[in-house]
Amino acid sequence: MSDTRIFEIYRYDPDVDKAPRMETYELELHGERMLLDALISLKKLDESISYRRSCREGVCGSDAMNINGKNGLACLTNMRSLPKKITLRPLPGLPVVRDLIVDMTLFFKQYLSIKPYLINETPPPEKERLQSPAEREELDGLYECILCASCSTACPSFWWNPDKFVGPAGLLQAYRFIADSRDEETSQRLDNLEDPYRLFRCHTI
């Protein structure tokens, strides 16, 4: 049985277009399991459709976009989970480079501001800085973030203050290093977050 889907895709090239528009495409699926597979097939029909992609395995975070109103990764979104009509927009809250591609500069600026690396002035041992199993377990759920920006760009506080508010992804990474027993900058890291906008713009909405 044929499976035809309708795609409404956000189209905008700021160098050419006066305003964004939505364009409609129809695609009959032939084995495309994931949304990214369908996008690759659509690009064969219209080479001008622009989006990011790389690993296709949910590791790089390149293909994050807004899918039917929710941010997610195209490569991890199964076509069977989607309705017949699929609306694709760029991640909200960041400048659009073209179509589904956004400028991630502000997102990575906030990420870099939390110093996402171990800081330890103690001379390194011959092999490695050891952790107990319990200390290592403290980091579970913290280091897996792939920096796709799906969470930060779903956050209204990040939309309003992207140049000041660290955002969910940045705060997660900040805690990842604060919780790391090998890091010696805990107090400085906390001081770095002590600002009405950097941390305390986070609200339950």
Residue ranges and their predicted role:
Residues 66-70:
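Short strand-turn-strand beta-turns centered on an Asx-Gly dipeptide
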Residues 46-52:
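Active-site phosphate-binding and catalytic loops of NTP-dependent enzymes
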Residues 55-64:
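Short, structured protein-protein interaction patches enriched in aromatics and acidic/basic residues
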Residues 78-79:
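A generic structural motif
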Residues 31-46, 86-205:
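Ferredoxin-type iron-sulfur electron-transfer modules in oxidoreductases and energy-metabolism complexes
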Residues 22-34:
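Short, contiguous acidic and Ser/Thr-rich linear segments
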Residues 2-25:
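Eukaryote-biased recognition of intrinsically disordered, low-complexity regulatory segments
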